[in-house]
Design a protein with these regions (language model features):
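Short, low-complexity disordered leader/linker segments with a strong preference
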Residues: 1-32, 413-419
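Signal peptide-proximal N-terminal region
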Residues: 26-28, 52-74, 165-169, 196-199
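Short, charged, surface-exposed loops that flank catalytic or proteolytic processing sites
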Residues: 335-347
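Extracytoplasmic "Venus flytrap"
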Residues: 31-55, 77-84, 106-107, 177-186, ...
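Extracytoplasmic ligand/sensor domains, especially the bilobed periplasmic-binding protein
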Residues: 99-205, 254-281
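Solvent-exposed, acidic/polar segments of extracytosolic/periplasmic ligand-binding ectodomains
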Residues: 31, 350-419
Length: 419
């Protein structure tokens, strides 16, 4: 029988050692990780979820004694969802705040303006959900937390058109609708490429201004073209406006969706309710058994426990696991190299895989993932606006890829909507 006094003593020693390492870390200058984030403006509904994920990582690492024996500290500013604010923020982070590491806010349109600043200061920069942001620069110290693989633009719309091509009869025509902004331009480019590849004729192809609030004229114009499928690349706020307009006006088409940003977040689905039914869209992660990578559900539990008080998306299935994984990568790279030298960290990140709550990740040319892993989903049976119906996958089916598939597409769009 074990000596209970000895066991208690050992436990006390373990606690004291952990406390001692935390205190020792606090006595040293913090390692500063700097970024901008959409805390206000149209992208805040997603951006603030990323900030909570960053905070959870920061607290966990500091509780373990920090990095290199030093505490970590997040240094961030609200970019107000405005790309014009980004360069000034990153210049301040580097020149005034003297941050050690740079990460980004959410999305291509807010990441791209920061890259020239990082390049001019020769700093490592980690982009969060930025589609092919480095394709113009080929900057060796840029890394992407977005699972679209080494050819992200080519991959982005591929699954949507692959699904369409398998239907019987296959749709013959497509309308492409996109916001006039960098991410959506790339998504539309991908859609055009795969329309050609699958022999589907483009009968409508227009971009609308980012400040559009009335989408009725766009939906009427699309309907006039009579496309058998519609591919949309939009901002999160636009996604709500577009789908509400479709719900009010009606749209006769066999397949609808593609690149509706924000629809992956519970907060957006809660706004839309049944208007999301039938949509086939790109997604990145769902809590299905095949995607429960080690540690991810523990993180989700922590996130969801704090989400109500933080006033953010209640489920956190979209951006948060990837935001947390991004910092896991930096944590592992710093721990392995025992340095904050951005050049040495970049070399290590290009040559080693990383274990994260989003699975194993490795980086190739331009800092993109070596393996593409987007998923394609369809929403269905959504009733009302209660969040509980989105907590497990009962209102979403993973259609592709095969390794994550949970069911088949309901086709055409009218059938999926129960019409």
């Amino acid at each position: 029988m074990k000596n209970p006094t000895r066991a208690v003593s050992a436990a006390i020693v373990a606690v004291m050692l952990l406390w001692g390492s935390a205190v020792a870390a606090e006595d040293k200058a913090p390692i500063k990780i700097g970024f901008s984030m959409e805390l206000t403006g149209p992208f805040a509904v997603v951006g603030k979820t990323g900030l909570l994920a960053f905070k959870i990582w920061e607290e966990e690492v500091n509780a373990k004694g920090g990095l290199l024996g030093r505490p970590v500290k997040l240094v961030y500013y609200d970019d107000q969802s405005n790309p014009a604010n980004v360069p000034g923020i990153y210049t301040k982070l580097i020149d005034i705040d003297k941050v050690d590491l740079l990460i980004s806010s959410y999305g291509t349109n807010l990441v791209a303006p920061a890259i020239p600043v990082a390049i001019s200061h020769d700093r490592l920069f980690f982009g969060l959900f930025a589609l092919a942001a480095n394709e113009k620069f080929h900057y060796p110290k840029y890394f992407s937390m977005l699972p679209f693989g080494p050819e992200p633009v080519k991959t982005f719309a591929a699954g949507y058109f692959d699904l369409a091509a398998k239907q019987n009869p296959k749709p013959k025509t497509v309308a492409i609708v996109a916001t006039d902004a960098e991410f959506q331009h790339k998504a539309a480019e991908s859609a055009r490429e795969h329309a050609r590849r699958t022999g589907i004729k483009v009968v409508y192809d227009r971009a609308y201004p980012p400040n559009t609030v009335d989408f009725s004229p766009i939906i009427h114009a699309v309907q006039a073209a009579q496309p058998e499928m519609v591919y949309i690349a939009s901002y999160p706020s636009d996604t709500v406006g577009i789908l509400r307009a479709i719900g009010e006006i009606g749209l006769s088409t066999k397949m609808l969706g593609g690149g509706l940003a924000g629809l992956q977040a519970a907060a957006i689905k809660m706004q839309l309710g049944a208007a999301a039914n039938g949509i086939v869209n790109v997604d990145l992660w769902e809590p299905v058994p095949t995607m429960r990578f080690p540690g991810v559900m523990d993180f989700i539990k922590k996130y969801q426990a704090r989400a109500p008080a933080e006033g953010v998306d209640l489920l956190g299935y979209f951006l948060p696991p990837f935001a947390y994984s991004e910092l896991q990568v930096l944590e592992q790279a710093v721990a392995a190299t025992k340095t904050l030298d951005n050049g040495k960290l970049a070399e290590y990140m290009h040559s080693h895989p990383f274990q994260t709550i989003e699975g194993n990740i490795a980086f190739g040319p331009d800092g993109e993932w070596t393996e593409a892993r987007p998923i394609w989903v369809q929403y269905h049976d959504i009733k009302g606006h209660d969040v509980e119906q989105f907590r497990d996958p009962k209102t979403v089916t993973i259609l592709a890829p095969e390794k994550y598939k949970t069911g088949d597409v309901i086709y055409p769009y009218s059938k999926a909507r129960g019409e």
